UniProtKB/Swiss-Prot annotation:
It comes from Rickettsia peacockii (strain Rustic). GO terms for cellular component: plasma membrane; proton-transporting ATP synthase complex. Keywords: ATP synthesis, ATP-binding, Cell inner membrane, Cell membrane, CF(1), Hydrogen ion transport, Ion transport, Membrane, Nucleotide-binding, Translocase, Transport. PANTHER family: ATP SYNTHASE (PTHR15184), ATP SYNTHASE SUBUNIT BETA, MITOCHONDRIAL (PTHR15184:SF71). The keyword Nucleus does not apply. InterPro entries: AAA+_ATPase (IPR003593), ATP-synt_VA_C (IPR055190), ATP_synth_F1_bsu (IPR005722), ATPase_a/bsu_AS (IPR020003), ATPase_alpha/beta_chains (IPR050053), ATPase_F1/V1/A1_a/bsu_N (IPR004100), ATPase_F1/V1/A1_a/bsu_N_sf (IPR036121), ATPase_F1/V1/A1_a/bsu_nucl-bd (IPR000194). This is ATP synthase subunit beta. The gene is atpD. Belongs to the ATPase alpha/beta chains family.
């Protein structure tokens, strides 16, 4: 088979025009083309056909030093990357090349980053809770297998630690794998995350096959083409884990889904498309849908995604976050105010929510306890102005009791993490759902009104709180 060869005729930023002559066929849309710049392989992706013999492409790598006239080869297929267990413990870029300096990824399985979503007949309609072992999430905003969770939080409130604990707990409780896609990541953040994963044992350098995570990075300094496609590369690896060995439960993290949209907007502008509202690409909903619809459960396995979402100027009506909201099953909001109290994980129990917190799915007891906990916390929140101005003495006896219980609940929502053992010195706790419900049920019913507040801080189950209370006496 003769290779389809063209030549670069124009380079504008990250957009390249390639002309194919000598009766060669034009590459299909989304095909990957290859060219070499000082022995460095550069991958281009076909975005548009211009006339009879020219294609307009988006570059997946830096264009520095590339000139007109360079030969370009059509690979005959979209971008293909290595998938499977060989990717565990490794970092790769959008086109599947390793960027961790540990040699090639020797995988026999190579897969295209573009795939259709599973057929409706193959998708699972069951809504099962994915138990994370983290009390505040399991009780108040439970995750569902194959669901999509939005993780909202600013800098320094514990997003990374929460992500690493989820990776650790899901691997332990469900034996599943994790894929982390860094979309428009700061290089420093990506590097820190990698080393923290090594320190906490999520990545095992000595025996990479025992690692629990594969990483795909499209960093902030990469061209927009790479940042717009790296989430699809990560998702392709996640799909391979889901479908192997008759099904696995896979966790898929995207940080940050806003930067995926932002990169798509840059690509759209470079291709000369007329922008829509607020300057975003006209295909915003389509781009988001193509990614989100592939994140789903089949009859064999599931992909549960946790997506960090940046909200520009705190405007939830901005088209980028508003488009992603339509796809989410649960939101986990991290609060700086709660982090300042020293309560970790700093999940806001009143702002976080989940579609599966429904008596038909989680059961009547779980739903009832969760709503009672939120009611106590909401009452405490509304009383805080009175407490600040007049003090506790001005409250009725009933309100005083509510405040005491709310403060205990707040502290009981904290929990020591396995991945934080290195810097807290406290052993991490995985709490089963039944223990979580029983503990909070006892708290709202007043069974533990005689125990001091401090007994509930940074413990796992209610039994540990009772033991801690004995040592405090």
């Amino acid at each position: 088979m003769t290779k389809n060869i063209g030549k670069i005729t124009q380079i504008i930023s990250a957009v390249v025009d390639v002309k194919f002559t000598n009766n060669s066929e034009l590459p299909e849309i989304l095909n990957a083309l290859e060219c070499y710049n000082d022995k460095q392989r550069i991958v281009l992706e076909v975005a548009q056909h211009i006339g009879d013999d020219t294609v307009r492409c988006i570059a997946m790598d830096s264009m520095e030093g590339l000139v007109r006239g360079v030969e370009v080869i059509d690979t005959g297929s979209p971008i293909r990357i290595p998938v499977g267990t060989e990717t565990l413990g490794r970092i790769m870029n959008v086109v599947g090349e390793p960027i961790d300096g540990k040699g090639d990824i020797k995988s026999s399985n190579i897969s295209s980053i573009y795939k259709p979503a599973p057929d409706f007949t193959n998708q699972s309609t069951e809504r099962n809770i994915l138990v994370t072992g983290i009390k505040v999430i399991d009780l108040l905003a439970p995750y569902t297998k194959g669901g999509k969770i939005g993780l909202f939080g600013g800098a320094g409130v514990g997003k990374t630690v929460l992500i690493m604990e989820l990776i650790n707990n899901v691997a332990k409780a469900h034996g599943g794998y994790t894929v982390f896609a860094g979309v428009g990541e700061r290089t420093r953040e990506g590097n820190d995350l990698y080393h923290e994963m090594i320190d906490s044992g999520v990545i095992n350098l000595a025996e990479p096959e025992k690692s629990k995570v594969a990483l795909v990075y499209g960093q902030m300094n990469e061209p927009p083409g790479a940042r717009a496609r790296v989430a699809l590369s990560g998702l392709t690896i996640a799909e391979s884990f889901r479908d192997m060995n008759e099904g696995q439960d896979v966790l898929f993290f995207v940080d940050n889904i806003f930067r995926f949209t932002q990169a798509g907007s840059e690509v759209s502008a470079l291709l000369g498309r007329i922008p829509s509202a607020v300057g975003y690409q006209p295909t915003l909903a389509t781009d988001m849908g193509e990614l989100q619809e592939r994140i789903t459960s089949t009859k064999y396995g599931s992909i549960t995604s946790v997506q960090a979402i940046y909200v520009p100027a705190d405007d939830l009506t901005d088209p980028a976050p508003a488009t992603s909201f339509a796809h989410l099953d649960a939101t986990t909001v991290l609060s700086r105010q709660i982090a300042e109290f020293g309560i970790y994980p700093a999940v806001d129990p009143l702002d976080s929510n989940s579609q599966v917190l429904d008596p038909m799915i989680v059961g009547e007891e779980h739903y009832s306890v969760a709503r009672q906990v939120q009611q106590v916390l909401q009452t405490y929140k509304s009383l805080q102005d009175i407490i600040t101005i007049l003090g506790m003495d001005e409250l009725s006896e009933e309100d005083k009791l509510t405040v005491v219980r709310a403060r205990k609940i707040q502290r009981f929502l904290s929990q020591p993490f396995h991945v934080a053992e290195v810097f807290t010195g406290a052993a991490g706790k995985f709490v089963n759902l039944a223990d979580t419900i029983a503990g909070f049920k006892g708290l709202v019913e007043g069974k533990y009104d005689d125990l001091p507040e401090a007994a509930f801080y940074m413990v796992g189950t209610i039994d540990e709180a009772i033991e801690k209370a004995q040592t405090l006496k």
